[in-house]
UniProtKB/Swiss-Prot annotation:
This protein's encoding gene: rnhB
Native species: Brucella suis (strain ATCC 23445 / NCTC 10510)
Function field: Endonuclease that specifically degrades the RNA of RNA-DNA hybrids.
Recorded GO MF terms: manganese ion binding; RNA binding; RNA-DNA hybrid ribonuclease activity
GO BP annotation list: DNA replication, removal of RNA primer; mismatch repair
Top-level taxon of the source organism: Bacteria
Stretches assigned to the RNase H type-2 domain: 32-220
Cofactor dependence: Mn(2+); Mg(2+)
Binding site for a divalent metal cation: D38, E39, D130
Cofactor note: Manganese or magnesium. Binds 1 divalent metal ion per monomer in the absence of substrate. May bind a second metal ion after substrate binding.
Localization (cell): Cytoplasm
Record key words, sorted: Cytoplasm, Endonuclease, Hydrolase, Manganese, Metal-binding, Nuclease
EC numbers on record: 3.1.26.4
Cellular-component GO terms for this entry: cytoplasm; ribonuclease H2 complex
This protein's name: Ribonuclease HII
């Protein structure tokens, strides 16, 4: 990986698209199955945080994998189906808004990641985790990669699976709670969502009562 002049690990030059080089470095050490881990839903005012763990087949990597945020919804959906077909194993886990409020979003996201890895049908030799922290309690060693979804195809695959899974959950939540428009914004703090919270109030079990502007203003 090319470094900037400062050689800061946070200021590396990102590749145009994620690749398999991170995984290959680990495989050269004799580690066969490498899991990519990512989550979706840290910032919204409503809904769960969802994590995914994916172990790709190095001989059958899906084409076009990228950070889910850089893909259209249609492309994410298409790649989601391809990942489920081609990956060696995929696992998803989520923590509810109540669980997020009971701890905090950072801890909840790490716990969702841990559960996703545990849910894989085989124990990975190593986990590549998007972000700065490796979840405690993983069943294998792990490495944190800042902007990992733009560096590792395994993490990119996990980001797509987590995002599509959560978006589908929020579409169902939107059908159950029409005033909030959850199927449109997936629970993020859009003007429409904030206005609906003001007029209708937050929904217990759906909204995150520890997040502004809900925090301290409404009873659970």
């Amino acid at each position: 990986m090319k470094r900037s002049a400062s050689d800061s690990p946070l200021l590396f030059d990102l590749p145009l698209a994620p690749d398999f080089s991170q995984e290959q470095q680990l495989m050269k050490r004799g580690l066969k199955h490498i899991a990519g881990i990512d989550e979706a839903g840290r910032g919204p005012l409503a809904g769960p945080v969802v994590a995914a763990a994916v172990v790709l087949d190095q001989n059958d990597l899906p084409e076009g994998l990228d950070d889910s945020k850089r893909l259209t919804a249609a492309r994410r959906e298409a790649l989601y189906e391809i990942i489920l077909t081609k990956a060696i194993t995929v696992s998803v886990a989520s923590l509810s808004a109540r669980s997020i409020d009971a701890s905090d979003i950072h801890k909840a996201a790490l716990e969702a990641m841990r559960r996703a890895v545990i849910g894989l049908t085989l124990k990975p030799c190593h986990a590549l985790v998007d972000g700065r922290d490796v979840p405690p309690g993983l069943p294998c060693p792990g490495s944190a990669l800042v902007k990992g979804d733009q560096r590792s195809v395994s993490i990119a695959a996990a980001s797509i699976v987590a995002k599509v899974t959560r978006d589908r959950m929020m579409i169902r939540a939107g059908a159950a709670h029409p005033p909030y428009g959850l199927e449109i914004h997936a629970g993020y703090a859009t003007q429409k969502h904030r206005a609906a919270i003001e007029s209708e109030g937050p929904v217990p079990g759906l909204h995150r009562y520890t997040f502004a502007p809900i925090k301290g203003r409404f009873d659970c």
